[in-house]
Every structure is written in structure tokens, then in C-alpha cells.
């Protein structure tokens, strides 16, 4: 049966640090995550991992997902090294494996 998915892109400490009304943005993202989960949808958290830009280098504080973001245990996490969430990531395969037909996109 086709499912929906929400892609939460770059909702990380680094990019969110200076975001205008960042806490309101996270609350809105969490509300949408909850609705997708209630309909048995797939939650995908996408993290930017930069090899030379220190705030987003894997393991650095800025790389971590925002502390207020709903990071439920069943959420799938995809790491990306470019601005394109599908380029050289398993995202396309994850969408197919989970029979995703409708995609909602949010993030920073």
C-alpha cells in the first residue's frame, strides 16, 4: 500500500542557530512529523555532513540534529555531502523500499 513520507532537511544545530523564529519552525516541523507518523508514514531526517565547513563536519556540535526536533526511534536518518538530498545517498532506495508515493518536504 502506498505511503507518505516527510523529508526533514538540514534541521541541524548549525543551520538553525541563526534562523529567524527557529523554535517556531521546529514546532511546525514536529507537528507535521506527528501527522505523517499518525498516518503510518515514513519520517526521514536528512543531515548535511560537510567535509571542510567546520560547523557541519560530522561529529561537531553544529552537525547534530536540533535538540527540539522530534527524533523518534523509527525515523530514518540519511547523511548527505551535497545540497541535493538524493545525490549519492540511499534516499531514492529508501523511498522505494518503503513504498512511498507522496512526499512532504520541510527543513531549513
Stretch-by-stretch model annotation:
Residues 1-76:
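Active-site acidic carboxylates
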Amino acid at each position: 500500500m502506498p505511503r507518505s513520507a516527510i523529508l526533514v532537511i538540514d534541521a541541524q544545530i548549525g543551520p538553525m542557530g541563526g534562523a529567524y523564529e527557529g523554535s517556531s519552525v521546529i514546532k511546525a516541523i514536529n507537528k507535521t512529523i506527528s501527522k505523517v507518523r499518525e498516518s503510518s508514514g515514513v519520517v526521514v531526517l536528512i543531515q548535511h555532513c560537510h567535509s571542510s565547513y567546520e560547523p557541519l563536519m560530522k561529529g561537531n556540535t553544529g552537525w547534530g540534529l536540533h535538540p527540539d526536533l522530534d527524533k523518534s526511534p523509527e525515523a530514518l536518518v540519511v547523511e548527505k555531502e551535497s545540497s541535493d538530498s538524493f545525490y549519492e545517498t540511499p534516499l531514492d532506495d529508501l523511498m522505494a523500499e518503503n513504498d512511498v508515493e507522496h512526499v512532504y518536504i520541510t527543513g531549513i
